Amino acid sequence: LDRIKQTLDKPREVLTLDKPHRLVTIPFDQIEYVEIVGKTLHFMLLNNGEESIKAPLRDYEEKLLDRPGFFKTHRSFIVNFTNMRELNSDTFISMSKRNVPIARGLRKEAKDAFVRFLFEDADRR
């Protein structure tokens, strides 16, 4: 019960997106993955949610990769391991069943990082 209370009392950590005429906050734990398409950065969220912003990936890359569980799988994608349900040889599958590619040169590193994250997460519980 104490662990549940601590979780509920803990403020949610959020990423702030600077959109035209407004600021939008996204809890980090709601992000499945981030994808850049053209000049638009798409934040794919749990339950098939999405927030988009006109910005390069590099504007948010450091903020994401500095957090535990975030990993760059490809020049256009960053995943949140917390919200990945499956890892295939070349793809992560998110909780919302969306496919996220893994660059050929990063497959072993992605697998190792994902397994390490899963074991570290289990140790925290």
Positions of predicted regions on the chain:
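Hydrophobic helical membrane-anchoring modules
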Residues: 98, 108-109, 115
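DNA major-groove recognition helices of helix-turn-helix
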Residues: 60, 109-110
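Inter-domain helical "communication" segments and dimerization helices
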Residues: 1-14, 101, 115-125
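Conserved binding/recognition cores within well-folded domains
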Residues: 1-95
